Amino acid sequence: MEMDYDLVMEDEFDALCLDVRRHHDSTSKTKYPAKLHARKVVRELGVDDGLIYLPGQPEISLEDSDQPRLFRQRRYFFYITGANFEDCTATYEVKHDKLTLWIPYVEPRQVLWFGSKPSAAECKRRYDVDEVRYTTQLSGFLRSFAAQPSPPVTYILHPKQAPDLGHGSQSQLCLDSSLLLPAMDRARVVKSDYEVAMVRRANNISSAAHRRVAERILRLTNEREIEAIIQAVCIASGSRSQAYPIIAGSGANGATLHYGSNNASLGGKQCVVIDAGCEWNCYASDITRTLPLSGAWTPKAAAIHAIVQRMQDECIAKVGPGAAWREIHLHAASVGMEGLLGLGILKGRREDVARAGTVAAFFPHGLGHHVGLDVHDVSGTLALSAAEGRGQQLDFGKRAMVTPSMLADMTRVSSSQDAVGGGQSKTQLLLPNMIVTVEPGIYFCREYLEGYFRSDPAHADFIDWDLLEEYYDVGGVRIEDCILVTEDGYENLTVAPKGDELLDVINKGKK
């Protein structure tokens, strides 16, 4: 069942009142398409026989403790089962198109302590698999498979995930750990319609959380209150897991790309960067908004926000089948450079600044990444974007550092390919049902700028250091949405308010 909610704050932040309403969820009666995914993997493997062996995540205790680690299912296992509980395994017999889910047997005394896991009958009803068996029978099945005359290849992700047959029988299996991972990555990069629905739902919940923060931001006093509201809204909607650690960085903290302390006072700050997205049924969302803490932008923050908003708007408009991500990233960098030149933060001849790649001092990360079972999801065989000649993939958004020299190399390669009519063979072209983030940002990190650029003759003269002092208090501005590539363009899956709507939501919260 899908859940809507009203989150009402009482006495500023003393209590939360949840009004929950249930209505029909169109995906609630639809099984996760495990067999569809398994067949996609086999097509990418290009084989007509063999066994795919994928263990799920076992229950693991914290170091030197009897308490379990927070459970997170292995994503490759989940992709071909949809099963989200501990100590399972999946096998797929390619020749017979047979997908088997192996589950742990739960003794009655275990139910007393920890509760039950789904039974074999329940799993058969719940999951799109051909058979459900207990893991106590798995080693016998594998020994029988290995005992065949010339047994087919068993495909595993990693050598450390080789199956344990017991009785020293492992050597009888013909194991391959080189082909399955890239095949599954190629299968995962283009989402099934069910997967799109999961990412959409995660975005809807996360967007509601961002909206609720905006409604309350004028009453909040500390970054941790932002984190608490986001978690409360997501949990109330049925999502207990965040896809990544919440970022709530105010003032100068917003210039740290992966700020995580979330405990600073909001007082006296111009902006707060909020980067937060929950998971729904193991599928991620990824959303960033930058909010003015007074309800109105300061002139400096307004100027930077306008540049970043233009970067995002124009880049989203370029998303569609056949688009090259590197070119979209370069467009974002160009818009950012023009904006900073217009403000005077960057100075000099436009051609010289572009050739040096100095704008990367302020926009130092990749434009975006795939989203799916992982927030920084797999890209398949080809990188979403790359700095050719440097072996640097830019598939992981703000986890992918883009230096000025890398940006300059990307620009040079792009220009040379345009001149000779070259293709994009080394990087990925967007395809329908890919989901990517578009997350440009401009940051004023004093330590980074002064530590690397002030003394570098290749860049120092292109930055007005006196004027820059006036912008350090802005911190950073980033705006991020999840974008679905469609047959004829794109769809923005993120419905969190931004632009003028965001300001309206913030200021209505005064009442």
From Swiss-Prot:
First and last residue of the signal peptide: none
Pfam family, one: AMP_N
E.C. no: 3.4.11.9
Manner of cofactor binding, per the entry note: Binds 2 manganese ions per subunit.
Gene3D superfamilies given in the database record: Creatinase/methionine aminopeptidase superfamily, Creatinase/prolidase N-terminal domain
Gene Ontology molecular function, alphabetical: manganese ion binding; metalloaminopeptidase activity
GO biological process, one term: proteolysis
Family matches, as InterPro entries: Aminopep_P_N, Creatin/AminoP/Spt16_N, Creatinase/aminopeptidase-like, Pept_M24, Peptidase_M24B_aminopep-P_CS, X-Pro_dipept-like
Domain of life where this protein originates: Eukaryota
Enzymatic reactions: Release of any N-terminal amino acid, including proline, that is linked to proline, even from a dipeptide or tripeptide
Keyword tags: Aminopeptidase, Hydrolase, Manganese, Metal-binding, Metalloprotease, Protease
Annotated binding of Mn(2+) 2, by residue: D275, D286, E480
Enzyme class name: hydrolase
Cofactors, names only: Mn(2+)
CDD domains: Prolidase (cd01087)
Annotated Mn(2+) 1 binding sites: D286, E439, E480
Family under the similarity heading: Belongs to the peptidase M24B family.
PANTHER family, A to Z: XAA-PRO AMINOPEPTIDASE 3, XAA-PRO AMINOPEPTIDASE AN0832-RELATED
Protein name in UniProt: Probable Xaa-Pro aminopeptidase MAA_08947
